A protein has these predicted regions:
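Short helix-terminating capping/connector loops at secondary-structure junctions
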Residues: 1-2, 55-59, 185-190
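N-terminal pre-domain/capping segments
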Residues: 1-26, 31-38
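Hydrophobic faces of well-ordered beta-strands that scaffold small-molecule active sites
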Residues: 3-9, 26-28, 62-66, 99-101, ...
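Catalytic cores of alpha/beta
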Residues: 10-21, 71-90, 135-152, 173-177, ...
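Active-site-adjacent beta->alpha loops and helix N-cap segments on the catalytic face
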Residues: 12-16, 32-53, 60, 78-81, ...
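Glycine-enriched alpha-helix->loop->beta-strand junction motifs that scaffold or abut catalytic
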Residues: 19-26, 51-52, 95-98, 122-126, ...
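Glycine-rich phosphate-binding active-site loops on the catalytic face of alpha/beta enzymes
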Residues: 24-37, 90, 94-108, 152-167, ...
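C-terminal alpha-helical cap/extension of soluble enzyme domains
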Residues: 69-70, 74, 95, 183, ...
Length: 266
């Protein structure tokens, strides 16, 4: 059995590091410091070019985040939806292999059928992951929301089990996995649960074994060392630009890969 390792990246260098480290799939974003926003077409094209230049070409899927702004409400206006639908169309035209999206109703916290349905329709046959918007929903509506996600046509749910980290939400993820199994038995719709947030080589094995999931998501990042002596200034109210830059580490990805692959060997 092969366990899927997805690495989220927001720079070209991080994408290359993830690929070289053994990632099975990339979640491509911009601004991971903001939780991940829609990436640029230029970044996607550069990564796809890197993959195509190998002999034979590497076939690592690149799923693009569709999220036009920061914020944990995941409730969007009609105009914001139009922005994201345009972005999706452009990214699909330039080689995106799948998309990552989530939207909730502002009044109920329920999965937004209309907005998610628009994205599913625009994606066509390309697969979709419902992102950690699911972690901002009410636990009492978890079964209902997972059924809606499956009904819409999403193939994967990225989750930390409604907690800040997947390790903290491990019991809820196991519950979600059981719900997904029941959904498939009743409807025939397969919904893969993929734990993410705070995943490392130290806890990946525990999370997979305790939840029964066959996929895991992480950033495998380290603080980038820099000899740059340029004076730093805040470029916004949050002062994020003054913080150290985090990038994907090939060594960290390899550690994660070895950790989850050890399950198969046991």
């Amino acid at each position: 059995m092969h366990f899927l390792l997805e690495i989220c990246v927001d720079t070209y260098g991080s994408a290359v590091a993830a690929i070289q480290g053994g990632a099975d799939r990339l979640e491509l974003c911009s601004a991971l410091s903001e939780g991940g926003l829609t990436p640029t077409v230029g970044l996607l094209r550069q990564i796809k070019q890197y993959l195509s230049e190998h002999d034979p070409p590497k076939t690592i899927p690149v799923y693009c985040m569709i999220r036009c702004r920061r914020g944990s409400d995941f409730s969007y206006s009609e105009q914001e939806m139009n922005v994201m639908l345009w972005d999706l169309q452009l990214l699909a035209q330039h080689g995106a292999d799948g998309f990552v999206f989530g939207a909730l109703e502002s009044s109920s916290g329920k999965v937004h059928l209309e907005h998610c349905g628009q994205i599913v329709a625009a994606a066509g046959k390309l697969p979709l992951t419902f992102h950690r918007a699911i972690d901002c929903t009410d636990e009492q509506r978890l079964e209902e929301n997972l059924n809606l996600v499956a009904q819409l046509g999403f193939s994967t749910v990225l989750t930390s089990g409604l907690k800040p980290t997947a390790e903290q939400g491990i019991d809820t993820i196991a519950k979600m996995k059981a719900i997904a199994t029941d959904i498939e038995k009743v409807t025939g719709k397969s919904l893969r649960l993929m734990p993410g947030s705070g995943i490392s080589s130290e806890n990946a094995l525990k999370v997979i074994q305790r939840t029964g999931c066959d996929a895991i998501h992480g950033s495998a990042s380290v603080v980038k060392s820099s000899d740059n002596e340029t004076r730093t200034l805040p470029m916004g109210a949050s002062n994020v630009d003054a913080l150290p830059l985090k990038v994907c580490s090939t060594a960290k990805v390899q550690e994660l890969r070895r950790s989850i692959d050890s399950i198969v060997k046991k």
